[in-house]
Amino acid sequence: MIMPRYLGLMSGTSMDGMDIVLIEQGDRTTLLASHYLPMPADLREDILALCAPGPDEIARAADVERRWVGLAAQGVGELLRQQRLAPGAVRAIGSHGQTIRHEPARHFTVQIGNPALLAELTGIDVIADFRRRDVAAGGQGAPLVPAFHQALFGDSGKARAILNIGGFSNVSLLAPGKPVRGFDCGPGNVLMDAWIHCRRGEHFDRDGAWAASGRVNDDLLASLLADEFFATRGPKSTGRERFNLAWLQERLAGHPVLPAEDVQATLLELSARSISESLLDAQPECEEVLVCGGGAFNAALMARLAALMPAARIASTDAYGIPPAWMEGMAFAWLAHRFLERLPGNCPDVTGAAGPRVLGALYPA
């Protein structure tokens, strides 16, 4: 018997590219194939511009959305051709879209991605608009991956955390006999990416090498950690509206000029400390931390996490057969399956929603 296949599309807050994954969904989720398309530089810059107030936003958002969908449809077509599959072999696409605003305190989150056009271009049913259902129920709308983490990793019999480090970091806390919990920890790669782009024109700090060449400035670190977000307990989520280059530059203005590499080292320490302190505060008995997302490839960051959480085993999700780069794409393919089966996709203890909700909306091909 052939199990249903789903595609998952993910373009996260790092905006470096489009992840396209193909899964098979039976009793377990199986990754069948994956594909990646780099984000064109002009599209990335135009998306970033939409993350802050500006002129003519509606027309600009519509244009960016059309181009984003074109990239997504291209990626879907390429993956299907690589796998020699017809569109009819896929039950549905789970499309996260591209977040341009996330302000749950004001009761809204906005992801662009025109699922109607995506369905038209691919010939595959699309499930999209996952986050707004949770926000409508009083939740944060994020993180949504903990339910998937629970399905994949929740039967180990140990206190375990699944840590996703993308532009922002979020954690899923799994423990025997307890409901899954989770929250956003704070900036993951977003500030390090912004700083290295500002100072060196590069999009990310490969292996954390630039950060490793600098020294942490304790005074700057203290001023960064003074942001009230870090003292707030979950449910909580955040985004570029709060943590961005302007936020960093405001805090740098209150300090003597520092070597650029020392700022980068301090930003890496901010990510490591905000993760470790919030994780251990919520689950001090944690035995294992499995890391996914782009941060799993940052050797300097992984080393700091290991040093700050010596009692826990720190490893990539690769150790359990799940490539860290594809976790979120798999999660949104899985959420498409949950929608079609009319099963809830959120965790109220994570997002603060009034209860379990079926997430998403259907756009038939």
From Swiss-Prot:
Gene3D superfamilies: 3.30.420.40. ATP binds at G12, T13, S14, M15, D16, G17, M18, D19. GO terms for biological process: 1,6-anhydro-N-acetyl-beta-muramic acid catabolic process; amino sugar metabolic process; peptidoglycan turnover. It comes from the Bacteria. It is an enzyme of class 2 (transferase). Its EC number is 2.7.1.170. InterPro entries: Anhydro_N_Ac-Mur_kinase, ATPase_NBD. Keywords: ATP-binding, Carbohydrate metabolism, Kinase, Nucleotide-binding, Transferase. Pathway: Amino-sugar metabolism; 1,6-anhydro-N-acetylmuramate degradation; Cell wall biogenesis; peptidoglycan recycling. It catalyses: 1,6-anhydro-N-acetyl-beta-muramate + ATP + H2O = N-acetyl-D-muramate 6-phosphate + ADP + H(+). GO terms for molecular function: ATP binding; kinase activity; phosphotransferase activity, alcohol group as acceptor. Belongs to the anhydro-N-acetylmuramic acid kinase family. Catalyzes the specific phosphorylation of 1,6-anhydro-N-acetylmuramic acid (anhMurNAc) with the simultaneous cleavage of the 1,6-anhydro ring, generating MurNAc-6-P. Is required for the utilization of anhMurNAc either imported from the medium or derived from its own cell wall murein, and thus plays a role in cell wall recycling. This is Anhydro-N-acetylmuramic acid kinase. It comes from Pseudomonas paraeruginosa (strain DSM 24068 / PA7) (Pseudomonas aeruginosa (strain PA7)).
